[in-house]
């Protein structure tokens, strides 16, 4: 009886009372190693409170944070061919799509919304990096083109938030075709007289950098974002030279004239509203000298 009381019953109770604990409750800062509770990170817009390090922000959270009161119209996801090349590497492409959809609860990497930022109507397009590295494929390209068409028909600006490793290799030449398609969409918006502003986030690389990510009228960037075409390691191996400290970061690109402003995530909605009001010649309250100066330089370039 003692054996049952002292061992079996406590063992059963402990097994029944055990609860599954999610693995991602605590998130480590890549810069300092500090562990941050995930709810604290989410409430701070995915910025590490102590170090100010900007973590990757989910696309849905970014749209909700950008628009006034988190209210916006979600633009529909276009229906396209799934896995047209029947591609397979270490895993079927169709399986990668299924897993990414379960993970992100999105059909593909692009989310787009129409709403207001400080009262100014605009279309926002956001990459979800957790969907196959935010890569540009047929579905993403079509969603981007449709978003530009909607901005053109609504006669409002479009703001792009790229976060991507580049073209989606599992779709081959069909993926690469999205580069000229999105470039034409940018041109059509500009021909209609509407501004196109890009907020470069970490990372923005590959074919996305070679197309619509660097075609904005104004380029903002989040602090510490990696922005470039080829990766640093590939460039160093090709040139057989060590690259400068901070190469391909948003701060480096600002210093060398490739980016107009580096803006902290908390300040992005207000900065965007000021920039767009200046570009559309609407009244703007007390825009600081840095904002006006950056826009003037970009306009004269």
UniProtKB/Swiss-Prot annotation:
GO cellular component: acetate CoA-transferase complex
Keywords: ATP-binding, Cytoplasm, Fatty acid biosynthesis, Fatty acid metabolism, Lipid biosynthesis, Lipid metabolism, Nucleotide-binding, Transferase
Enzyme Commission numbers on file: 2.1.3.15
Organism whose genome encodes this protein: Rhizobium etli (strain ATCC 51251 / DSM 11541 / JCM 21823 / NBRC 15573 / CFN 42)
Pathway: Lipid metabolism; malonyl-CoA biosynthesis; malonyl-CoA from acetyl-CoA: step 1/1
Location (main, coarse): cytoplasm
Protein name: Acetyl-coenzyme A carboxylase carboxyl transferase subunit beta
Assembly mode: Acetyl-CoA carboxylase is a heterohexamer composed of biotin carboxyl carrier protein (AccB), biotin carboxylase (AccC) and two subunits each of ACCase subunit alpha (AccA) and ACCase subunit beta (AccD).
GO molecular function: acetyl-CoA carboxylase activity; ATP binding; carboxyl- or carbamoyltransferase activity
InterPro entries linked to this entry: AcCoA_carboxyl_beta (IPR034733), Acetyl_CoA_COase_Trfase_b_su (IPR000438), ClpP/crotonase-like_dom_sf (IPR029045), COA_CT_N (IPR011762)
Function: Component of the acetyl coenzyme A carboxylase (ACC) complex. Biotin carboxylase (BC) catalyzes the carboxylation of biotin on its carrier protein (BCCP) and then the CO(2) group is transferred by the transcarboxylase to acetyl-CoA to form malonyl-CoA.
Catalytic activity: N(6)-carboxybiotinyl-L-lysyl-[protein] + acetyl-CoA = N(6)-biotinyl-L-lysyl-[protein] + malonyl-CoA
Name of encoding gene: accD
